Every structure is written in C-alpha cells, then in structure tokens.
Amino acid sequence: MTKQKVAILGPGSWGTALSQVLNDNGHDVRLWGNIPDQIEEINTKHTNRHYFKDIVLDKNITATLDLGQALSDVDAVLFVVPTKVTRLVARQVAAILDHKVVVMHASKGLEPETHERLSTILEEEIPAHFRSEVVVVSGPSHAEETIVRDITLITAASKDIEAAKYVQSLFSNHYFRLYTNTDVIGVETAGALKNIIAVGAGALHGLGYGDNAKAAVITRGLAEITRLGVKLGADPLTYSGLSGVGDLIVTGTSVHSRNWRAGAALGRGEKLEDIERNMGMVIEGIATTKVAYEIAQDLGVYMPITTAIYKSIYEGADIKESILGMMSNEFRSENEWH
C-alpha cells in the first residue's frame, strides 16, 4: 500500500497505540485531541505518559488541537473517542470535511440516549458523499500490549468489503493483523457488550471467587451477548470470532482491562464514583450496561448477567447477592436462544 494520511481522533491509550501501528507501516499519522498539555507532550517529548509511562513515540507521530489541521488532505479518519461524544465529534468532522475519506472507528459502546451503534451514528452525521461505508476496527486488543508490538489479531468490519480490505491493508504488519468481516452488527455489539461481562468477571474476582465462577460468567456471558446480537440482526458465527469470544476472553480475564478492574473494585465494595475517579479513564461497560439492559427489556431477550450488573450499578443492589441470585434462576437448556 502507498503512504496514506490518517487522522486519529482521540489520543487515548488505544488511539496512541494505533498511531504507532500506522507509523510503523510508513503512513502519515496525525492525532487530534482537546487537552493542550497532552498535545504539547506528544509533540515535544514524544510521550503520552498518562497512558504509557515508559513509551517513547516516533517523532513522525504528531498531534494537534486543530481539527481542521488534522483532517486536511487525509485519506482516512479513525474515531477513537468515548462513545458519549462520538456524535458531537462526528458533527464537527462533517462541518469541516471537503473531500471523501475512509471513515473508521475503534470505540466500543452504544449511545446511551438512542441505543445506536457507533457506525450508525457516523453514517447519520457524516454525509455519504464525504465518506466510505464505515469500517469498524475491533477485537482482542490491549493497548498496553500493542504499543510494545506484541502480536495482535483483530477484525475490520464493513458493509462494503472493499472498505474493510483497505483498512486491513492499512494496519496489517508483522505484529498486527486484521481479518475482514461484513457483519457490522455482530462486531459492534460484541465489542460493546463484552465490557458488561468483563465487569461481572472482575466482580467475581473482587468477591474472592475462583476460576470456575469466572469461566461460567464468561461462557454464559457470551451466550447472552449472542442472544441479543442475533435479535438485532447479527450473524451468530461472528461471536465465535476475534471480535466475539476473542475480545471477551482478553477483556474478561486481564488486569489490563479497565472494565475488569472496575468490576473487581465493585466486588471489593468500592463506590463507583471513586472507581471512575481513581481510574482516570472512561469505563465503557458502566454506561453500556444500562443501554443493554434497556434493549433487552424492550426486545424480551434473557440477559441475567447484564441484569445482575445493572441492578448492582443502577439500583443499589448488593453485587454479591445479585450474582448469587442467578444461581436460583429457572432451569434452562444450555442452547436456548431466547
């Protein structure tokens, strides 16, 4: 692939890690953010120490506070901003874009107010004549590992397979590999909903439960993610892939996962507001729990783990009692899909 110009919107941990992947591939990378000290640090010290204390970025990776500068003459735009501001940033991008670009996102969540997937938001806010079909970049990927060039395999999903193949070529190298998929619904719901299950798995750890319990919540969590996804129109096979079970494993078992760490802290009895303040990063699984619970209620989808986490976070229920309460639920077949 010839050298491409890519704007990455959101210089958080994942946006920064992906900027390095693209830079390693010889592309021109521009990070955009709205925190002056962070932008200055990236440009002058070539570090982003809030997320990576010991990593020095290549000097070719630049950052700017000016969205117009970031978008000038780019071939592709990657959204890696928190779910709750995706629509706002997309509107700002739409007001500036003056040429067609490949639009990608690598965030994992559902919009709280509308319950919409992020690709839908981008499609609504950015005119079709200025963008490709949206490409979703998702899968089992800790930024802490990608930034040190550990082997990582993820998915590029789009309704337009050629757009997905473009992104596959853009990112893939000797340590970072993408597989294409056309099931955007499946990939996005898997990426968003696994954060809820990671909170549950972390809570079990914080409560002192062992591997049996954690394996159970991850496995049954995959079942309820799949139930809801299929109801929304996803291909069930997607949940057996990198963006499904792969992402669920990496997020539901690792201390690198902010959702797992948040769940562990909840299990230890810490207050949510203290957890969010101490972590200093967005915990997408908290907001997604509410959205998923509301969707499940509307569609009549059985999601006991999501319900237990929802009641603990939003209704003040004791998290241990909520989780143990699932042990007395109605007997079911393992393969029920409703």
UniProtKB/Swiss-Prot annotation:
One cellular-component annotation, GO: cytosol
Keyword annotations of the record: Cytoplasm, Lipid biosynthesis, Lipid metabolism, NAD, NADP, Nucleotide-binding, Oxidoreductase, Phospholipid biosynthesis, Phospholipid metabolism
Catalytic site positions: K194 (proton acceptor)
Binding residue positions for sn-glycerol 3-phosphate: K108, G139, S141, K194, D247, S257, R258, N259
Enzyme Commission code: 1.1.1.94
Major enzyme class: oxidoreductase
Places the protein is found: Cytoplasm
Residues binding NADPH, per UniProt: S13, W14, K108, A143, R258, V282, E284
UniProt signal peptide: none
Pathway named in the protein's UniProt entry: Membrane lipid metabolism; glycerophospholipid metabolism
GO BP terms: carbohydrate metabolic process; glycerol-3-phosphate biosynthetic process; glycerol-3-phosphate catabolic process; glycerophospholipid metabolic process; phospholipid biosynthetic process
Catalytic activity reported: sn-glycerol 3-phosphate + NAD(+) = dihydroxyacetone phosphate + NADH + H(+); sn-glycerol 3-phosphate + NADP(+) = dihydroxyacetone phosphate + NADPH + H(+)
Main location class: cytoplasm
GO MF annotation list: glycerol-3-phosphate dehydrogenase [NAD(P)+] activity; NAD binding
Domain of life: Bacteria
Family matches, as Pfam families: NAD_Gly3P_dh_C, NAD_Gly3P_dh_N
Family statement drawn from the similarity comment of this UniProt entry: Belongs to the NAD-dependent glycerol-3-phosphate dehydrogenase family.
Function summary: Catalyzes the reduction of the glycolytic intermediate dihydroxyacetone phosphate (DHAP) to sn-glycerol 3-phosphate (G3P), the key precursor for phospholipid synthesis.
Name listed for the protein in its UniProt record: Glycerol-3-phosphate dehydrogenase [NAD(P)+]
Organism expressing this protein natively: Streptococcus pyogenes serotype M1
Gene responsible for this protein: gpsA
